[in-house]
Amino acid sequence: PPRSTLFPYTTLFRSLMVVSGGRIIEVGEYSELSAKFSSEISIVHFKDSLIMPGFIDSHIHYPQYKVISSYGTSLLEWLNKYTFVEEQKFSDIDYAARVAELFLDELIKNGTTTAMTFCTSHKQSVDVFYSAAEKRNLRMIAGKVMMDRKDRKSVV
């Protein structure tokens, strides 16, 4: 069977995925690859399991983790009533780190391994986010939010 993302609807049965340094280096028939790598690898057998790639989230805000589903009649009302209040707490590096850990654990629980993530305007929110992501071997693109209107001085 084809072994490429050019054939996305292909299912491999009785196969082996060889991972080194957190990266997939080869995928193929179990009988072929287990012989090829027999002295180099330890095998973890996921019998009767489905192995899939991690999901990619192209737009997510980690500082809004604790205000998910908060009610607002408009975007500005929601930002002022919940989001900005929550985001100003990220000036505390310990708070930002705790939320980063919770947020990333939730992503992993739901199969997301890569994300384009918005942090807050506080530099430390980005630093602790990357530290937590690195500990979990996640692939993240992140940066601090920039605002130039309708902002609160406490979050810039």
What are these regions (language model features)?
Residues G54-S58, A115-T117, M140-K144:
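Hydrophobic faces of well-ordered beta-strands that scaffold small-molecule active sites
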Residues T10-M52:
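Histidine-rich, glycine-flanked metal-binding segment
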Residues D92-L104, V126:
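Short, acidic/polar
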Residues L107-A115:
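Short, surface-exposed connector motifs at secondary-structure boundaries
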Residues P1, T5-L12:
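Short, small-residue-biased leader/transition segments that mark boundaries at the very start
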Residues K66-A96, R149-S154:
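Active-site gating loops and adjacent loop-to-helix segments of metal-dependent hydrolytic enzymes
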Residues Q124-V156:
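Metal-coordinating catalytic core of metallo-dependent amide/deamination hydrolases
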